[in-house]
Swiss-Prot record:
Extent of Low complexity compositional bias: 696-722, 738-747, 830-839, 913-928
Biased composition (Basic residues): 237-246
Superkingdom assignment: Eukaryota
Gene Ontology annotations of biological process type: ubiquitin-dependent endocytosis
Gene: prr-3
Homology family: Belongs to the arrestin family. PalF/RIM8 subfamily.
Compositionally biased intervals (Pro residues): 840-849
Polar residues bias (residue ranges): 297-307, 314-326, 581-596, 929-949
SMART domains cross-referenced by the UniProt entry: Arrestin_C
Biased composition (Basic and acidic residues): 793-805
Protein function: Required for the proteolytic cleavage of the transcription factor pacc-1 in response to alkaline ambient pH.
SUPFAM superfamilies recorded: E set domains (SSF81296)
Identification of the protein by name: pH-response regulator protein palF/prr-3
Positions of region (Disordered): 1-43, 225-326, 568-675, 689-962
Amino acid sequence: MGPFSSASDRNSAAATAAPATATATPSPLSKTPSAATSDDSSTSKKFLKRLNILPLRSRTRNIADFHIRPDDPHRKYSAGDHVQGAVVLTVVKPVRITHLTVLLHGYVRVYKGPGAQNNEPVRSPAEIKNISSRGERKKYYNGYASLFQDEQVLSSDGRLEPGRYEFNFDLLFPEKGLPSSIDFERGTISYMITATLTRPTSVAPTTSCERKIYLMEQLDVGPLAPPKAQTVDLRPISKRAKKKRPAGGDRRSVISSERLSADVPAESLSDGDSARINDTSTEGSLSIVGDDVGQEGFSQAPRSVSHSEVRSLSGDSAASLSTHPSRAYSETNQLAIVGSAMTGKRISFADERTIKLRVEVLKGGCLPGDVIPVKVSVNHIKMIKSMHGVIVTLFRQGRIDSSPLQLSKEDWKKSESDDYYYPKSRTGLSGLSLSSAGSCSMFRKDLSQAFAPLITDPVNFSATLTTSVRVPEDSFPTIKGVPGEMISFRYFVEVIVDLGGKLANHLQGGASSGSRVGATGVVGTPFENVGTLPSWGATGSTSILDTDRLKRIQGVIPGYYEVIVGTTDSNRSRGKGPQRPSLTHTPSVTGGSNYVENEYNEKGGWPNSMHDDDGYGPESANPHDDYASYPPQTTYPHGYVQQPPYWNYVPDSSQHEQAIPAPHYIPPPDLPDENSLTEKERIRRAEQRLLPSQPPIAAASSSSFSAAVPSPSASSHVPDSSLLLNGDNIYDAEDDVPTPAATPATASPFDHALAPVYTPTPAEDLPSAPTLEELDRPPPISRGPSHHPPSTTEDKQELERRRLLAEASAPPEFPEDYIPDEGGGPVTPAGPSGSRAGPSAPPPAPPVAFEPSAPVLFENDEDYHGGGYTAGGPSFPSAASGNGGHEEETVPEYTYNNHRPGSVGAVTVVGNPSSPVLAPASAFFPASGSGNVHDSPREQGQQARSDSSSPPPIEYLPRYER
């Protein structure tokens, strides 16, 4: 007897104590009072009570609640797991019990029809017969079979007082041999927890309750090898030899000498017609003929172990009749091509005119959502082009058998030779049997489908392509191993190859209509190094082409390969297998290369087992087939298993070091403690963190756009001309050119753009080489007094921005209000602040003794030239002629205009490209001055005071006459 407990003390009660003595608190449920019988009750009531005609009257119940409560009700168990929980029992009146048991059991049930589960009675676990011993001939009990039972006794004989009881249990699943739970319209595989309460009464002595739990069989698809490849050889039959058919004598076989076996769904072997492949060429026709060749071109499983002769056609040369033994399997059907070897004079002709087809499924197991790649290799005798040349369909085959036989291996062999399993006809209706041999039913469900074009090389008539089909996400694992194969669900890949090139005429557009793009593959031919033609298809949610009628078309070869849909992949968990690909792309490699590590041996080539007994050697003999050049999957590190290896190529160590720099250690930022900061400071720092960040290079280039703020104290700074003469500052020479110091009263609106403080950048962040335009630029010159320190920036974009700003702010060449000076005399130059020259003008500096190729003008150049000179004015000697000894050249001529609205004055400069840089006025005029001055010094001072808040200073615009 198992332990039981009450609500007050769950584990304190002894296992051997009677339930009546347990410390159970009575439930506060009210008891129904028994009806008192009166002496004057009528005889009619006693009669009705005796006949029990009042079934609707409420009866007193001793047990109010009886149910099972698992500890983890939503868990999916596996083989070997423990199932823990409690049986809850609520008693309202004292009740005497014999015992209380709990049972964990699994069973298989097959219904007779789609709706029979509602009509058939519910079977008790005790009524379901257990599996019979090996060798015993016994049918399963009317579509029922028990998988296992694990029983535990919770309470023995005793009395239960009113109260609420909980009996804990711990049950165990077997270690192996349990299929996954499934419920469908024709059967079920279920696992139940059943609690049974037995009372010492003759009427309804047992009361039961049950709880359903779910089990998932753990299938590891990692160690599974791919299915064995199938090779089909088609050899021609001469038309002349076909007409000559002697009655006896020598015979010649025309079928391939290869025989391959594989599992095939039985529903595909219902028709016994032979598959024929015809070619309309003048040489003859291609055909596959055989006694055991079924509808799809594959042989059915023979019922006895005997030799099956191959149907052959006669020929001109002598040949021998060849037979091949059939291989019998106890629980599977066979998929074989039976043939005999070609002998005689026609061997060379047959080898040259043989069509070879090889189909390989590159994965033997997969998980839901995975992609199954399929490789097809064709060596044809002519050029074919079929846009639906390869059709790959993934389907699930369900098989149920309501009355299987439990036979041993010896009995199974015996049943193949006698009429035990397939009895003779008892009705005389040509094989019609009314026995239970027809209790098996099979169903097919197409899950997904993919199409791929088959285009052979016009040179060697060969093609190799790789396509794929996707397993739906909602697919459940393969179910096998049920006793007697009462219920089984298996997955197959059907590959249909159109060797005649006429399949498109039979599709009539039905292949692509209503279907969406499904699994994508890469398809190509051996003469194409890169596959460019994607495959298309459909899934279970869209229309899928019915391939049953296509398999009867001449020139169509089908094949079937079983794949296992599992729950785990040990290779993938270790990082050695391919990860599950995406829905929009299928890993596929042209030329037949794949990423399955089981297909690649340690020597860098494909295993010889694929080509055993085919007589043609490895397909790598084709010069266009280079699939063996790909490295195996196991050469890739763990980080590169997320995608197929052909696009995750890892370079060698030398290339890796050159391509990827060494990582730099970046220490974590030193964040101050904000607890000591004020709220205002924390808000300000939070706002700064929200500002967009800048990368180091971008920050260096953008910071170089700023210019230093000129200070009045630096107005007398003169750059060192020796640096310019040596050519050490050829990239930022324009920054050393002086500009007028802007006062707050006369500041230009563009000075604010140059106002931000400039932060020097490291030398490695600056431009490393000049442009061609800068190399063609002549060396700069230092002239006149400098009014601001030279800029430290060397950014070319900043120099270009300054030049554009200067051009935008310059006045037009000839303003609209231009009036030539009637006096023709020179004009007194203005001061650096934009007013006319006064006594406080700075003294001029001596010119530099070399000349540029073009004049460079700035705002303070008015200090060095006199006004009033028109375009027809006199020319002056060059400043370089007196110092450097150069020849005299004409100096640019200027016209001063003080009538431009909004400015103090403007000067238009007219010059030629060969003019030297303007020198101060002291270089051209004597100290006394010889020009005409329009304003006196007093008027100039008044004008300067009145224009203290004037807009920009005087500006100059060079004009070159060529």
